[in-house]
């Protein structure tokens, strides 16, 4: 793999990057806010591809947990691009992406992200769970915390006497997403499926009678 495109829209800030096999970014763009992602992400990918002017061998995309709309938009774009270009597609979880920011971290990394209904999604050891702010689990084991809800979680852990490091990583850098895919490729592991990882089930429901009326 020589160049990997990366697409992320799991959290409030979305981003796209083109990253070389040695890990350096040849293009990187961000867009703030979730509204309008369907309209803004595809042209942003085209802009990044044009600026990089390289042959991309794979595309990586964050698959969650995170925003329903953001995940669906990013995954659909990545799937379409990979299929059209005939290249590999790598799914990358949110905690995998954040872990790429701290290659020398010698303690577990908890990823805390804000969720609907005043909750926090907490990802520990690859498992994501939803908690009310007051119900964040305590630990006396050394941990580090990242994500857009890291401040709240780190404060509660510290107040309970925990050994906690509050990292400076709040949003995902798409370069980390590419790094995770590159690491998986270099380790000889197959790509993770680019299917959304949800903590809550999607709220959309089919009508009880189906999408079409019964024939008469």
Task: Tell where the protein language model's regions lie, with residue ranges.
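N-terminal phosphate-binding loop and adjacent alpha-helix
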Residues: 32-48
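Short glycine/serine- and small hydrophobic-enriched flexible loop segments
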Residues: 46-47, 83, 179-183
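DPxDG-like acidic metal-binding loop motif
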Residues: 58-89, 94
């Amino acid at each position: 793999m020589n160049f990997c495109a990366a697409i992320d829209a799991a959290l409030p800030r979305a981003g796209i990057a083109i990253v070389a096999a040695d890990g350096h970014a040849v293009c990187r763009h961000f867009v703030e806010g979730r509204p309008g992602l369907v309209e803004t992400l595809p042209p942003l990918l085209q802009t990044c591809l044009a600026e990089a002017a390289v042959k991309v061998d794979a595309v990586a995309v964050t698959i969650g947990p995170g925003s329903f709309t953001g995940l669906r938009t990013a995954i659909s774009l990545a799937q379409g691009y990979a299929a059209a270009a005939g290249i590999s597609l790598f799914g990358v979880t949110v905690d995998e992406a954040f872990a790429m920011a701290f290659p020398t971290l010698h303690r577990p990394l908890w990823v805390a992200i804000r969720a609907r209904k005043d909750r926090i999604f907490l990802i520990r050891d690859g498992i994501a769970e939803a908690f009310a702010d007051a119900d964040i689990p305590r630990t006396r084991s050394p941990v580090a915390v990242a994500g857009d809800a890291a401040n709240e979680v780190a404060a509660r852990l510290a107040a309970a006497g925990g050994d906690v490091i509050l990292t400076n990583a709040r949003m995902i850098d798409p370069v980390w997403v590419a790094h995770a895919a590159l690491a998986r490729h270099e380790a000889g592991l197959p790509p993770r499926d680019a299917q959304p990882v949800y903590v809550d089930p999607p709220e959309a429901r089919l009508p009880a009678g189906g999408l079409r009326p019964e024939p008469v």
